[in-house]
Amino acid sequence: MLVDMGEQYMLTTILSFLIVTTVVAYVSWLKTKGDDLKSSKGYFLAGRGLSGLVIGCSMVLTSLSTEQLIGVNAVSYKGNFSVIAWTVPTVIPLCFLALYIIGWL
């Protein structure tokens, strides 16, 4: 029986997704199996073991979500680049917030 090339690519895509997801889940489990994830401090702040740079980068990159990658481009194309003024200035306050979270401020 001949398999349609579209079906073959879909099967390859699904299998690749399942393999990569399984590997990421297993490695994540190995790295966090001894961590305190039951308390809010352990879960949200990684037991206060992260630096301000890591927390700040995480907060900035979280704000650059799909909305930023798709929505801002569409609005900029339709109008102008003023919509980017919402994200760019937030980098500095987010860095200060990260320092406050870890207790340096």
From Swiss-Prot:
Write out the annotated subcellular location. Answer: Cell membrane
Residues spanning the membrane: 10-30, 44-64, 83-103
- Quick one: where is this thing mainly located? membrane
A molecular function annotated in GO for this UniProt entry is:
transmembrane transporter activity
Question: What's the protein's topology in the membrane?
Answer: Multi-pass membrane protein
Keyword annotations of the record: Cell membrane, Membrane, Transmembrane, Transmembrane helix
Record flagged with keyword Cell membrane: yes
Origin, by domain of life? Bacteria
* KW Nucleotide-binding (keyword) present: no
Q: Which GO terms describe its cellular component?
A: plasma membrane
Which InterPro entries does this one have?
Na/Glc_symporter_sf, Na/solute_symporter
**Sequence similarity:** Belongs to the sodium:solute symporter (SSF) (TC 2.A.21) family.
The name this protein carries in UniProt is Putative uncharacterized symporter HI_1315
Q: Which organism is it from?
A: Haemophilus influenzae (strain ATCC 51907 / DSM 11121 / KW20 / Rd)
Lineage in the entry? Bacteria, Pseudomonadati, Pseudomonadota, Gammaproteobacteria, Pasteurellales
